[in-house]
Structures are given as structure tokens and as C-alpha cells.
Amino acid sequence: MMRLRSDPDVTIDEITSVVETDPALAAQVMSWASSSYYASQSKIRSVEDAIVRVLGVDLVINLALSLSLGKSLSLPKDNPQSSTPYWQQSIYTAAVIEGLTRAMPRELRPEVGMTYLGGLLHNFGYLLLAYVFPPHFSLICRHLEVNPHVSHSLIEQHLLGISREQMGAWLMRFWGMPEELAIAVRFQHDPAYIGTDAHYPNLVCVALGLLQNRGIGHGACAPLPDALFERLGVSRDKAEAVVSKVLEAEVLLREMAAQFGQA
């Protein structure tokens, strides 16, 4: 999937054959395509059908890649109380980022598929944190519960000397993922970031902030400066409208997140 993701000449047949070699993944793709969230007008009869008529190449690769990477690290059993479930937040964030990206002026707009994948994988460092530091992870969860006004990055730096964003960015690079993804993961909570490929972390930052304002997510919510919206070419009102539209499909998005959790 990583090779296909980086191949500009990838064909439908190549993607179909890779998906079909994994029965669980093939069933998942069929399930996504048949979901009422994508509103297919007719029955989906094959993986190729799902890709060509409903989901498209980019979305299938990104969803399958996220699912495959997610399988490599299991969800932690311990979580901060009142936190949004991992895949639920990932799906919401990706959906909002997709809407924000499409709302950007064409001359500023980054690759939609890449920004969507950045949303799906933005919190992957959380899984890595739980996997690498299991004894410390529970301690981090307890600190987050009693200090909801403090950024998780500060707590993690205090207890471990490293944050989930740093770990997640390292893992993206270690796995040979596109550099845009590593940057999106590393700088997702920095509204002032204007470095290389800034649109990717800026989009994650806006999506996370707006969702937190609607009660989705966990922890301290830093204000989103006007300059951040200006760099993306999207007004604050338009961005809020994107979030509202995504949340109209909340039930369907939760179903999709549940499928990720069961895979």
C-alpha cells in the first residue's frame, strides 16, 4: 500500500489485486462502499466496483493504509476519561480536513488525498506512546484527567522527555511515508507553523481546534488565530460550516469508525 500510495501511475487493477489478497481488507472496502455515508445508488458487487463507482483510488489507498498501520499497534486499554475514541476522532478529523481542503482556493490547495491521510494518522503517536511506554502511559492518562487545561504535549514532555507528535513523526519517516505526513503529525498543534508544507499541519490544527470546540477530542484547546485561517484562504465562518456539515453525518461517521475498531 505504501508503494502504491507513492506511485503516480498506479492502476485500478493493481489496487484491486492488492486489496483482494487480504480478505478482511476486501470485506472492509466493500462495507465502506456500501455504507449510506457514501450514498451509492446501486449494489456494490466487487472490490473493483467499490473503487471505480464509489470510493475512488485515493480514498481506498488512504483508508486501507490507515487500517493496515493501525493493525500494527493495538489500541490501548487505558485511556483518559471523557476522551473521544481513537478511530472516531481520526475519522472526524479526516472528514473535516477534506472539507477544509476543498474549500481552499485552488492555487493554495494541497493534495486532498494527502491531507485526508494526515487527518487519519494525525494521532498515531498516541498508539506508539502506549506501545513503547506502557507503564508510563497510564500515568500520562491520569495526569491528563486531572489537568484537562494543560496540553498533552507538555505533560508528555514533562514525564517522558518526548511527545506523541515527535514519536509519530519519527515513525512516519521510519516507515518511508511522505514527508508531508511527518510534518503534519509533528506540527499539528502549532498554529504559528509557516515552514515547509505548512498547509498540512495547519489543516490538522484547524480541524482539531474546531472539533474540540464542539466537544470532540480531549485536553486544552488553544485559540485559533485569524492568521491561520488567512494562510489557508478559508474564512472562520466557512470552516465552521464545514464542521457542521461533517457533524450532520455523525451517526454514519461513528459507524465507519466502529468498522476500523473491529478490523
Residue spans for each PLM region:
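Conserved alpha-helical "signature site"
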Residues: 1-141, 148-224
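Terminal helices and disordered tails flanking the catalytic cores of nucleotide-processing hydrolases
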Residues: 226-263
